[in-house]
Structures are given as C-alpha cells and as structure tokens.
Amino acid sequence: MTSHLSRADLSVAAPIVEFAEAALAESGRDIDEFWAGASAIIHELGPRNAELLAKRDELQKRIDDFHRENPGLPDKDAYRALLTEIGYLVPVPEKVSVTTENVDPEIASMSGPQLVVPLLNARFAINAANARWGSLYDALYGTDAIDQTGELAPGREFNYTRAAAVVERGRELLDQIAPLTEGSHRDATGYAVDGDGLIVRTEGGDRRLADPAGFAGYTGAADAPTAVLLVHHGLHAEIVIDRSGRIGTTDVAGVQDIVLESAITTILDLEDSVAAVDGDDKALGYRNWRGFMDGSISESVTKNGRTFTRVPNADRVYRTADGGELTLPGRAVLFIRNVGHLMRTPAVLDRNGEEVFEGILDAIMTSLGSLPELEGPNKGTNSRTGSMYIVKPKMHGPEEVAFAAELFGRAEQLLGLPARTMKIGIMDEERRTSANLKAAIAAASDRVVFINTGFLDRTGDEIHTSLHAGPFLPKALIKQQPFMKAYEDRNVSIGLECGLDGHAQIGKGMWAEPDLMHDMLEKKIAHPKSGASTAWVPSPTAGTLHALHYHQVDPMAVRATLTPTGEEALDALLVPPLAGEGDLTPEVVTQEIDNNVQSILGYVVRWIDQGIGVSKVPDIHDVGLMEDRATLRISSQLLANWLQHGVITEEQIDDSLRRLAVVVDEQNAGDPNYEKLAFADGDKPGIAYTAARRLIVEGAAQPSGYTEPLLHGLRREKKAEQASA
C-alpha cells in the first residue's frame, strides 16, 4: 500500500508529494505555501462539491417519483412543469457572449480531427501528440479505406497494384485541394518554386495553382524541392518528393507520399480511458503531463527487433516563395481531461482523514504540471497564447460548470498564474447540461474553449434519469431517436448563438470502430457537415483519414447556412427513447443481452485485472470496438433498466455472463497477462467477473449510472490481491 506523508493538514500519497515538490522546486515556489493553499482549496470547496452531488441525488429522486406515478412517456407539459419546479430546468439567459481570450488558432478558428488518448500510457500519448501530421499513403494502404480484395489485397510482400490505387487517391486529393489552372496533378512530372509560387511541370508545359494562395512553402532547392506545402481550408498538406523512395521511384513526379495535417488537437485523458484508482496511478498521470509540458517525456519502443526512443516531434520549418521562413507546429495542441465532480480519491486525505474530491486534486496538480510550458524554459511549446486547456467532463448543469470555473480560478491564485489562464472544455454529455446548455456556457463564458457531444455518456445519463419511466430501446435504436438529433443540433446551434466562433471548438463524438475506415470515410463526414469544427477519432491513422473530410467540407462555411433550433428542439430533447409495443421481441432481447454482456466483460476484465482503461474489445461478431467507461455506462445502464422493468431476469444475465465469459477468454487467449473470467461450478468467481455482474444488477443504484464507484473499489481490491500474490 502506498505510504502517505503529512503536508499542512493533509495526508498525501508519497508519489503525489514527490511529483508536486519536484515541480515546485523547479518553478521556485514555496513548498509550505503551496500545501497550505492546496489545503484551503480542498477544505473550502470540498463541501460545495458535496452539495452539488447531493442536489443531483435530490433531483433524481423527484424525477424517479414522477415516473413511478406516471409510467410510460410523460405528458410534455406536466413533465416540463416538474423539471422547472424542482430546478432541473433553469431560466435561459437572454444573451450570452463568449469572451474567452488568448486561445490558440487550432481551437479558436481551425477545423480538424481530435484524438483522445490515455495519459497513463506514455507511448500512446506521444503517438497522439505526434498525430498532428500523418502519412496519407500509409493510412490508405494499411486500412480498408481502399478495397482489400482481389489484386488490391495487402499481403506479406509489398503490393504495387495496391500502392498505385493509393497514389491515384492522392492525386484526386491534390486536384481537390490545389487545382491547377489547366490539367491535373496526375499529369505532373515534377514540382518547382519561383518568386510567383508553385510550378507544376507537365509534358504539356508548366502549370500554376488556380488559387496561388494554396501554396504555403517548400523544403530543399527551389528547382528541385524535397517537399511542397499546400494549404486548404486552414489545414496543410505536404507533398513529399523523393525519387529514390519505394513509391517515388515509380512516380513520374517523384512523389513519395502526401503528409496531411491531421489531429490538430489531442486530449490527454485522466478520466474515462484510464484506470487511476490510487496515489501511484494519479502520480503517473501527473508526471506524464508534466513531461509533455517540460519536453522531457520519452518512451523506449521496440519494433521489428529494433529499439528506439519515441519523443514528441519537432516543429516543421519551410521556406516561402518570397524567401522567408514558415514554422508549423509538429505536435497537436494538447488538452488535458480532468475527472468530473463525482469521485473522491485515496491519493490525498483531508484534515478529517476523508478522501478528497479527485476533480479538485486534478485541477491543482495538472495546473502545477503545466508551469514549465506556461512560464518556464519550455514556454509556448503547447499553447503559443499562454493558455492551459482542461476538458471537464460529466458536469450536470450550470451550477457545476460555475463551480469548475471557480475551482480553476482558485488554482490560478494558488500558483500565481494570470486570471483565466486555465480554459475549460465543457463536455455536453449529461442530460441536465444539454437541457440548460446556454446557461452552462454562460457560467464559464470567459473560459470556455470547447463544447462537445458524446452519444455514449449522454445516453447513459438519459437511461438513468428516466430509468423508472419504462423499458428503453436497444442501444442501436436509441441513437436514431428524436432526442439524439435534438441534442446534436442544439449543441451546435446554441454554441454558435453564444459566440463560440473565434473562441472555441464545437465538437462531435468518437468513431468507435478503428478497423472500419471505409465506413468512417462514408459516415463521419456528417460531423463537419453539421458545422462542428472537430470530432473524435480513435487512432492517428483515423485522424489522417478524417482530415480528408475537412478538405471536402468547410464547417465554417456550413455554419452560415444553419437555422437556429427553437423550443421544439428542447421538447424533443426531453422525450426519453422508450421501447414501444413490439420493439422488444424475445429474439431482440436475447441478442441485446449478449451484446451488452460481451461488451461489459471484455472491457471490465482488462480494467480490473490490468488497469487498462481503454481497449479495442471484440464484440459478439468479432468486430473490434473501442471501449471505455462511457461504453460501459450505457451497456450496464440499459440492462439495469430492463431488469428494473422485468424485461429480463437476473437468471438471464447470469446465463449470458457464464456463456460469454468463455468467449471473452478465447478472444484474449493471446494475451500472456490475461486472467480467465470463466470458472467452474462451485468455484468463486474472480473480481473482474464480479465487477461485471454488479455493474448490471446494481446499476439502478449507481449515482447517475456511473461505473467508477464500483470499478475503483474493485480495482484496488485486485491490486492488493496481486501485490500479496
């Protein structure tokens, strides 16, 4: 067990002390003053945090009582009256004007993909930071974005026919983003630069760009550049020229690759994609964050028998046509996602020996970890405007947003940072925030840099809020219901109404099928078409492919065509997606039980046994799906809802758990660290299996349907078991 040390009137896990005091010493701040100030924040804001959680419980009780008395779809007027009476719906501010200052252009004015990655995994995090730039050729060749059958099938040997198809797609892109005055980039035999810009050599003569402003720079000699930099819709694309490369030697123009500016922002996550349950885990996350901020983070990687050190990429430097120099960031602008307001952590105990709120600790420690980038020798390497970007998840309504803003202000005072250095990204993923979004933005109108929708957590809260109204539809059908469209449309509309343009991102949710890139290219274009300036992707490769959508669609232009949502959208938002007569046939129910149980088991076993917070978990059909605590929340809440209404029984759940434990074990057979879920009759199930079952059968009792309270306790139990083995 991690030892604790006394600091002020706090008891602090030794790894947290070590992290904090090293950071304080380097920044020249007084250690005793810091701990005294941290204690003041914890003891003054902790009770307020608890009051906000108590209000959640009280509102939920009133809504539960209403649904018990009025089962089924509620009467619109009576339901609205209840929500207003109890303070669930608050008055809508007449006018909200976002005034956030010192925001980097990647957030304020550019559009492009966004990665989310667990901060406890340094290798993943470095890869995500470096996903600012990605090879289009690699992304196309290595995925199903290009047909993988017949003569295009990838194999052990390099497939030049497949490569030719990749090159053709690349030329299509160049013609789209940098059209010529005449002809096509397919006709190019070479590229050169002069004082007037880019020259495209062809057999029919030299050509110019139809829009000369599309040329941004080059590297190498002007008459034989090694790279040509283009810009389109605010995103850059680099034509890599190497006539000795495997592709370049076969390309008449010597084009070896096209490198796209891809994930312009990345969220390093301390929340849903990590398993951080104690002082050791929390300190690892804080150290990794500081490693990005001071430039020291690195990771040794072994690949194909070769070991090398992976570090964040350097900036990219180009020459311009007029002889000047252009420097572009080599890395994504980094957000850090703190946890929400719910959980306490044993990493720090207050003066009464009680665990402190984890979100308060995160605000203090992650801002401390940002000091080298905000004021030290590494200043400006993440934010060139002097800001720190924090995504704050799972907030319920404007009061909780205001509390987060106050907490950030206190952390700034503690560290002597300029007011409003710490910016806030508001996750619009809880129903009370969605219903009061304008007021929520108003509560942080001078800090907000991001609002974002997410189907999974939002649906998890939808189910839990209306748990007693009746049985919900299966997961796949919930997404198609009117409340979801209202949710997505209102997020963009209200964000624009509040003036987020030029100050903040409007974001959309995750593509959860990392192996299905063809489908992603077909479907995820809907996000920029909605007017959203960013959307989540599960991998650097997906980021590069999703970047294509922002060349096809300019979200900023889309916004000019949008019609504001009205009161009817709020009405639609408040209609729970309950199942109708005939929706829940025995076949549908059986399949949905197994689908959700499979998802829960496959995710929880890695979370509990190995501390892995995000996984590509094979579903019942062996399709790999990205799973994190948000997917766990919706799966467990749906089954809890069906149990509550007698659609299913505990016996059915137990039967599915026992059968699918065997399947999940088989799917993980290649993992040497895996511990089996299946157990013989009469034997005691393991902790992971127990966790999966409890999340379902106790789901109705979990606060807002969250999975963290059960997971954290059982993960600590597993860590203790492993330590004593």
Kindly give the residue locations of the regions a language model identified.
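Generic, well-ordered alpha-helical scaffold segments in large soluble proteins
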Residues: 15, 19, 23, 37, ...
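Hydrophobic alpha-helical scaffolding
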Residues: 6, 10, 49, 53, ...
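Catalytic or ion-translocation cores adjacent to nucleophile or general acid/base/metal-coordination motifs
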Residues: 2-10, 16, 359, 382, ...
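Flexible, glycine/charged-enriched surface loops at secondary-structure junctions
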Residues: 73, 273-281, 375-384, 417-421, ...
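Acidic, glycine-enriched catalytic cores built around paired aspartates
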Residues: 82-84, 88-142, 146-155, 159, ...
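N-terminal-proximal low-complexity accessory segments that begin disordered
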Residues: 1-70, 77-90
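Generic recognition of stable, solvent-exposed alpha-helical segments in well-folded globular domains
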Residues: 11, 15, 19, 33, ...
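Catalytic alpha/beta active-site cores
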Residues: 2-3, 78-81, 85-403, 410-417, ...
